[in-house]
Curated annotation (Swiss-Prot):
This is Bifunctional protein FolD. It comes from Acidovorax ebreus (strain TPSY) (Diaphorobacter sp. (strain TPSY)). Signal peptide: none annotated. Keywords: Amino-acid biosynthesis, Histidine biosynthesis, Hydrolase, Methionine biosynthesis, Multifunctional enzyme, NADP, One-carbon metabolism, Oxidoreductase, Purine biosynthesis. Belongs to the tetrahydrofolate dehydrogenase/cyclohydrolase family. Catalyzes the oxidation of 5,10-methylenetetrahydrofolate to 5,10-methenyltetrahydrofolate and then the hydrolysis of 5,10-methenyltetrahydrofolate to 10-formyltetrahydrofolate. GO terms for cellular component: cytosol. Its EC number is 1.5.1.5, 3.5.4.9. Pathway: One-carbon metabolism; tetrahydrofolate interconversion. CDD domains: NAD_bind_m-THF_DH_Cyclohyd. GO terms for biological process: L-histidine biosynthetic process; methionine biosynthetic process; purine nucleotide biosynthetic process; tetrahydrofolate interconversion.
Amino acid sequence: MTAQLIDGNALSRQLRTEVAARTAALKSRGITPGLAVVLVGDNPASQVYVRNKVKACEDVGFHSVLEKYDASMSEEQLLARVQALNNDPSIHGILVQLPLPKHIDDHKVIEAISPLKDVDGFHVASAGALMVGQVGFKACTPYGCMKMLESIGMKDLRGKHAVVIGRSNIVGKPMAMMLLAANATVTVCHSGTADLAAMTRQADVVVAAVGKRNVLTADMVKPGAVVIDVGMNRNDEGKLCGDVDFEGVKQVAGYITPVPGGVGPMTITMLLVNTLEAAERL
């Protein structure tokens, strides 16, 4: 058995077409969704991510603002810029690209963003809303993973066991909460888990999100399981790869996401969805 691919590029194109149509409808009422992206420093990976986000905005008809600052920018200066963007009525979403320089407190900056413009879904208000099932912005990567599950008919996960590998605030924790909201029975595994394979072999859905190559191999996967690979790593040849041993696991799984072309494009797409919804809520 060879797993079916869940094509993140194809699903992203479909969703972005819907976003563009809803954006056009908003524009006819005089509202153009606006996203401000703030980049501090010259991290090469961050520069690529930021360019991709700005281009995606332009492609669906958003107004986008890219603010680039030198790595020497002070925390106080950055907080002042965030406050100015909070007060700008043409901006509906604010994204501060992480990581920030070491002298700036990531948490303090994220909490300075208005919850009404927290389209990354990282603010404690967004995390709290997710926890208690209220309306709020969902973290983009796990939100994209849920859309991928939905695309293969797995919107309701009642009776399914989902295992999340990783407990970060950006992916692991919100992923677990979204799976729980979809009625899955959820297990969260991490560096303190005694027997990871014993957990994953029981899983109908596995989400790997630790940033470590080959954390999930074929012998750890239940036949027919759905495997979502959030990882972004480089192999020995320097090529992009995920957390999953793709070649091995695809022989066992029922569905699998590739890297690249899986979760990555969905993350940016859900950022667009969140920004659009921020504008629609006005």
